[in-house]
Amino acid sequence: MDKHITTPITEEVTKDLKSGDYVYITGTIYVARDAAHKRMIDALQRGEELPINIKDSTIYYMGPSPAREGRPIGSAGPTTATCMDRYAPTLLDLGEKAMIGKGKRSKEVIDAIVRNHAVYFAAVGGAGALLSKCITKSEIVCYEDLGAEAIRKIEIRDFPVIVVIDSQGNNLYETAIKEFAAI
């Protein structure tokens, strides 16, 4: 089923999303990869506040290429999510509601998704140039020294994703294998 949602993504929204749903997201989300995630967790361990508002946030695991003239961002394809697995449960426990990436997630992340009524979306790998057309604005908000791994805030319009793991823990990567094995 196709669904259109707007950020911030709240628990009421995540409870309505089911594994396998096609979703189009509009609104403001953050972009961060493993170096930025590590830096956020290190800051928390030092007793510092996060540099972004994590409550009801969506983080897209992506490292953009340089923007072409007249565009807010270059190619914007997803990064493999497992690189963030050691950090994701902490951010989910602090209020993050959605993650966008590609690939499988660890049991610890799936448990945190269920515990916090969050979701994990997949974006299509290899389609970064097409995905960038859904990004209308991009700005670095912190950790500029990380270059392409700096945390960005981006505005998106009808950004296409698929619900891979829903708030109940249903996992498309597992159910799809079983479904196609039965054919």
PLM features: what roles do these ranges have?
Residues 1-9:
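Short, structured beta-strand/loop micro-motifs enriched in basic residues and often containing a Trp
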Residues 87-88, 164-183:
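Active-site/ligand-binding-proximal alpha/beta "capping" segment
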Residues 31-32, 36-159:
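Feature captures the catalytic cores and cofactor-binding loops of soluble hydro-lyases/lyases
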